[in-house]
UniProtKB/Swiss-Prot annotation:
EC number(s) from the headed UniProt entry: 5.6.2.2
Name listed for the protein in its UniProt record: DNA gyrase subunit A, chloroplastic/mitochondrial
Species of provenance: Arabidopsis thaliana
Subunit text: Made up of two chains. The A chain is responsible for DNA breakage and rejoining; the B chain catalyzes ATP hydrolysis. Associated with the mediator complex.
SUPFAM superfamilies for this protein: GyrA/ParC C-terminal domain-like, Type II DNA topoisomerase
Cellular-component GO terms for this entry: chloroplast; chloroplast nucleoid; chromosome; mediator complex; mitochondrion
Family listed: Belongs to the type II topoisomerase GyrA/ParC subunit family.
Segments forming domain Topo IIA-type catalytic: 127-595
Superkingdom in the source lineage: Eukaryota
Subcellular location: Plastid, Chloroplast; Mitochondrion; Nucleus
Amino acid sequence: MTPVLCHSTASIPNPNSLMSLSSTLRLSSSLLRRSFFRFPLTDPLCRLRRTEPSATRFFSSRTPRSGKFVVGAGKRGDEQVKEESGANNGGLVVSGDESRIVPFELHKEATESYMSYALSVLLGRALPDVRDGLKPVHRRILFAMHELGMSSKKPYKKCARVVGEVLGKFHPHGDTAVYDSLVRMAQSFSLRCPLIQGHGNFGSIDADPPAAMRYTECRLDPLAEAVLLSDLDQDTVDFVANFDNSQKEPAVLPARLPALLLNGASGIAVGMATNIPPHNLGELVDVLCALIHNPEATLQELLEYMPAPDFPTGGIIMGNLGVLDAYRTGRGRVVVRGKAEVELLDPKTKRNAVIITEIPYQTNKATLVQKIAELVENKTLEGISDIRDESDRNGMRVVIELKRGGDPALVLNNLYRHTALQSSFSCNMVGICDGEPKLMGLKELLQAFIDFRCSVVERRARFKLSHAQQRKHIIEGIVVGLDNVDEVIELITKASSHSSATAALQSEYGLSEKQAEAILEITLRRLTALERKKFTDESSSLTEQITKLEQLLSTRTNILKLIEQEAIELKDRFSSPRRSMLEDSDSGDLEDIDVIPNEEMLMAVSEKGYVKRMKADTFNLQHRGTIGKSVGKLRVDDAMSDFLVCHAHDHVLFFSDRGIVYSTRAYKIPECSRNAAGTPLVQILSMSEGERVTSIVPVSEFAEDRYLLMLTVNGCIKKVSLKLFSGIRSTGIIAIQLNSGDELKWVRCCSSDDLVAMASQNGMVALSTCDGVRTLSRNTKGVTAMRLKNEDKIASMDIIPASLRKDMEEKSEDASLVKQSTGPWLLFVCENGYGKRVPLSSFRRSRLNRVGLSGYKFAEDDRLAAVFVVGYSLAEDGESDEQVVLVSQSGTVNRIKVRDISIQSRRARGVILMRLDHAGKIQSASLISAADEEETEGTLSNEAVEAVSL
């Protein structure tokens, strides 16, 4: 009768317990881990049969059915069923042969049965043994092939033969699981050192399935024979009975190297899992020898010999922090990148291609190529024109053709970020150690293997010693017989039987029974003198062998030396160069800046604090005196405040009217179309209520010799080192202390050799040297820059580079210079849309706190809006290559060439630059250099071929 789970009458649970029975069956992985070490394999809880007899009781929450509950028929008729009273909730008691009834509470049985199942999965299926690095199925496959004589020197045999042998003798599970395990041990892209040589289709890195087992053939790899299966017949490991007790199989293979680290392992058990990366054989031997020589070696010392895993598919391991964690604690994250190189496809068009030659471990190449194609299709990856897989038997080659002008580094970074070309290997180094699953670091794994290998070498030495001693004992008896051959022959011929001859030899020469038997088995041809010499030589050889074995077994040091020697021999025979390269740069995590092109862009800020970022080709080049193109719709009573040119990777410094500076990357500002209103700055910066941004400075590098020159509306100037602004916190920092009623308006980058040009709203211009402005700290006030009259205010400021100072100093203010055709010039822009160029040599340098020279003759309702130094670079005809962007209060933008603006004297009124009509006044102006124009010529749209980006 099958045992039935039951409760005894005295232990009937209450209804609440019955209702919560299902929750009792929910076992967590934490319960398994807590319980595992509490119950060894020999614990009674792991037994399937219970011996305590009692009555079997069935419980039901429903009313019992009428009649008798028949438990069985035929021979079970002696069992009787009787009804219980309602007090027992309608239970039925089965009485009969109580020795065949097993009472047990259901929730306990469920817990313990699940625990037994979990232990079975842990120890017998999912986790590898730290000694030979194999799971039971892999061990049984290799042992079955060894028993079938499928060595590397013999012909291949069908895989179906191996699978059948494994299933029939050692592994009574599905043939698919066995064949899949066999196939994986033959794949060079799955194991760093394959253990089986395959003949036929064994799958591919594209996840193509292998051919059926009836078609493929296999045999053992020489490395498997040398590392795992040698000395198997010398009592080096224990053998256990197979599933039906018909024969024996090894409990572990006598590995000569830590195969768990050599090929790694992965598996999912109940409540725990393992994922161990593969390593290089040569480095593994080196670190093993280092630990043998110095058992107290630190992890850093071991890393000098084996710095990181070595994956069979190669790749680049990024950083060593994850490797250190994995080797120290057993858990870590190793970031692996595929290996790619840039190849020039067409020298004429300068089109490039990214060639992928290696991919991360356990990455499906076909899936990777398909994923890249999908990302190109949905515009996630840009700059790619074609992708194809040219891989063959000679190696991997995935070609990704780039569009003309595409940045290979940017495309690669996007591939790393959006595809499996960069992936992480999560190490979880769990293995079976001393019959229990254990999380171990590198040193602990190596030490566990060394202890096991010492045991194997000791058992092998004792086995050889025993055989040598037995053989020497026999040889000594044979030599005695040969020394007395005539007497021995006479004694044997006189003996009446075999047993009497044996007894006579023992008594006559003091031989043992085995020695006497050996003498009787000698043939006549071995009685020659030559044969006698062979026996004596063998005796001497055995004596020497016994001495060496006894010396080996005398100390652990000798055993460790032999382990090291055998490991070095394997290294000399099987080692190969490292495939996975190490890059000691970072963890491989890509920031936004790594995947965003450093393109030039336009940034517009309104008076009410709205900002937007636009593409460089948004505004085309126009002629002087035209209306221009709108920069977008503005809110009611809003006007354009600033309009500048920057690059996506620049740090953009936002200076407020209160002297506070904020910072963000340019690409973090949302990109908008020309007609969009923009994003409020308060959503990007932590600005105070009522605070306005008055100046924006893009910075690509915080150089030591660069400064920020700040100028307030009331003419207060200050110079601060640019490096002090490299670490601006999110809430901003103080840039300048302001006097009451003053506000910060202009901030420019400069060097000590530059000049600064300042202009007031009434047209007064002053030139001063930047080195004449003392460098101050951030949290200080400035000094007076320009003496202002009649409630005049500062209108603009610009920097004159040091390269232009020499030209300016060589020229004097002369009438012949009024129409000077070579720069540099000061470009004046008025609020009413007028402007002109005045030679820079028309203005003399002065110290700070001076009135300056008049530079413009205004109409009654006009004032100066901006001043720029132009003429940094000239065309072949000596004219300026720069352009100026004008923005009106209504948001209309016009971009014109500087060369189209007339060169006039200081007292002239200028020419019309932009017809304002209903657009209000000029709100801001920005200058575009010729270098900026050249950088972005290839990025303009077809509709703006003649345009240059801002």
